[in-house]
């Protein structure tokens, strides 16, 4: 028999190569999304809706994939339907004027959103009654419901920022602002951790995360926030430099928490990335993890402080 050549493992990419891949993927993806938001023509709203629906669908697919890898039963189709229904109905309520007759105030938009979730949740319970299995009844409902909240409900705050009724045309600028500040937090944390990281922060969850990286993430997000507001303050209703400093710190910290929460899900499911769509990033949830918790924080700050 001929000698078999020993197989060699693929060489591990350097940190600089991974960083470059991550940077290129992030810039290209968010440039497409932002271009759709600022296209300034009749189809821009529909492009925005299409992107939101695509992110919701892919994010829920990945989340339910991870839960099923843990052996948990989930109503996948109903969960995805609920996520798309929530995003689509909120869009028509805010952007297409379905809420105009009652006044599109933030509280009323929240009531509308809650109504959709309640109706969907009742349908989820009926599904469980129809397909009852004693051992997994509780987990099937809870896991399906949590997927809707974690992906679709949190992501829906981006729409509520974009179409916030009390800030004239500032909504897209606030969406752009919180996305850029959050992503600079991610990149700042990665760079600081790679260059200066010595002290592990959460070795059981994400061994690569360090306290130096966390510090860099917050510092860079604050700097990015101040620079953005300095140049575009005239486009952002109610925003001042002091708010930029505070929001930069809040969004930087929340981005870290969002990243760690997704790491908990991935480690619990035994996967490295939630998907493999984007070089250097992974899946949709790897792209969105730090944004999911920052979207509601940005909305709440906008509603209760900047426009109060």
Question: For each of these PLM feature ranges, what is it?
Answer:
Residues 249-257, 284-292:
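Hydrophobic transmembrane alpha-helical segments of multi-pass transport and channel proteins
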Residues 182-194, 254-267:
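Short helical (or helix-break) motifs at transmembrane helix termini and adjacent helical loops
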Residues 268-290:
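Interfacial loop-to-transmembrane junctions
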Residues 2-249:
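Membrane-embedded alpha-helical bundles of polytopic integral membrane proteins
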Residues 221-222, 287, 294, 303:
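Hydrophobic transmembrane alpha-helices of multi-pass small-molecule transporters
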Residues 265-266, 289-298:
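C-terminal transmembrane helix pair
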Residues 301-308:
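Juxtamembrane boundary at the C-terminal end of a transmembrane helix
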Residues 23, 63, 187, 260-263, ...:
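Generic detector of well-ordered alpha-helical packing
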């Amino acid at each position: 028999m001929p000698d078999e050549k020993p197989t060699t493992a693929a060489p591990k990419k350097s940190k600089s190569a991974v960083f470059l891949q991550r940077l290129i993927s992030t810039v290209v993806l968010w440039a497409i999304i932002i271009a759709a938001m600022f296209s300034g023509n009749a189809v821009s709203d529909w492009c925005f809706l299409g992107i939101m629906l695509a992110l919701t669908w892919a994010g829920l697919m990945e989340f339910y994939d991870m839960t099923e890898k843990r052996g948990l039963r989930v109503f996948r189709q109903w969960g995805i339907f609920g996520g798309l229904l929530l995003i689509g109905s909120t869009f028509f309520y805010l952007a297409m004027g379905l809420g105009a007759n009652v006044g599109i105030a933030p509280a009323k938009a929240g009531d509308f959103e809650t109504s959709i979730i309640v109706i969907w949740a009742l349908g989820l319970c009926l599904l469980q009654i129809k397909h009852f299995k004693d051992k997994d009844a509780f987990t099937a409902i809870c896991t399906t419901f949590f997927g809707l909240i974690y992906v679709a409900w949190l992501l829906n705050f981006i729409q509520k920022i974009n179409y916030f009724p009390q800030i004239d045309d500032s909504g897209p600028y606030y969406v752009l602002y919180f996305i850029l500040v959050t992503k600079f937090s991610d990149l700042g944390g990665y760079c600081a951790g790679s260059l200066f990281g010595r002290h592990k922060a959460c070795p059981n969850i994400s061994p690569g995360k360090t306290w130096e990286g966390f510090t860099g993430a917050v510092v860079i997000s604050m700097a990015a926030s101040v620079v953005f507001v300095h140049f575009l303050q005239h486009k952002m209703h109610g925003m001042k430099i002091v708010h930029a400093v505070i929001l930069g710190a809040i969004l930087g910290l929340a981005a870290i928490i969002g990243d760690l929460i997704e790491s908990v899900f991935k480690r619990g499911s035994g996967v490295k990335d939630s998907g493999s769509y984007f070089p250097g990033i992974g899946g949709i949830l790897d792209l969105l993890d730090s944004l999911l918790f920052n979207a509601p924080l940005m909305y709440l700050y906008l509603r209760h402080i900047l426009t109060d």
